[in-house]
């Protein structure tokens, strides 16, 4: 039980550090990689539909390998925090950043997307999605909304 909680804490740290960079990034704004945008869009569609367990399966193996407790915690958090916002009415990608380094994470390829989003019960919201390129494929490794 202790290991999944530690892994959940590490995953949440990656989410918040990575997505905090989206809000005010020291990295240059870039034209987003179309493949990364497609992955983020597919992942957000699963979240929008309330398919949180499906969205969890799209995380990198290093996050999924923490086990069922990690998935249960992540799904529970999304149900408690994201579900009450209601349907997604609109979403617009407004900024994208790229970096090879991320505090607390191995060097690699990271893209950060910042969206202006309107939900059924929160008309002005911001979403941040962090993507990691592993084994040549983009995967969502972080998500935050406010």
Q: What residue spans do the PLM features occupy?
A:
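Exposed beta-sheet edge and beta->alpha loop/turn motif
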Residues: 94-146
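A general secondary-structure boundary signal
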Residues: 31-35, 58, 126
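Bacterial N-terminal signal peptides
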Residues: 8-16
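Short solvent-exposed beta->alpha transition segments
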Residues: 37-38, 45, 53-109
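Bacterial N-terminal signal peptides that target proteins for export
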Residues: 1-8
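Internal amphipathic alpha-helical segments of the cytochrome P450 catalytic fold
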Residues: 52-53, 137
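Short, low-complexity N-terminal intrinsically disordered segments enriched in polar/charged residues
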Residues: 4, 18-49
């Amino acid at each position: 039980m202790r290991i999944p909680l530690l892994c959940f804490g590490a995953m949440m740290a990656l989410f918040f550090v990575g997505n905090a960079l989206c809000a005010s990034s020291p990295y240059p704004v870039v034209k987003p990689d179309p493949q990364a945008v497609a992955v983020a869009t597919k992942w957000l569609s699963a979240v929008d539909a309330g398919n949180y367990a499906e969205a969890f399966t799209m995380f990198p193996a290093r996050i999924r390998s923490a086990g069922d407790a990690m998935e249960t915690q992540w799904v529970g958090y999304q149900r408690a925090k994201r579900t009450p916002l209601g349907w997604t009415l609109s979403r617009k990608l407004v900024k994208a950043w790229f970096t090879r380094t991320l505090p607390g994470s191995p060097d690699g390829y990271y893209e950060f997307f910042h969206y202006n989003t309107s939900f059924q019960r929160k008309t002005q919201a911001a979403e941040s999605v962090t993507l990691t390129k592993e084994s040549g494929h983009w995967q969502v490794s972080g998500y935050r909304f406010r």
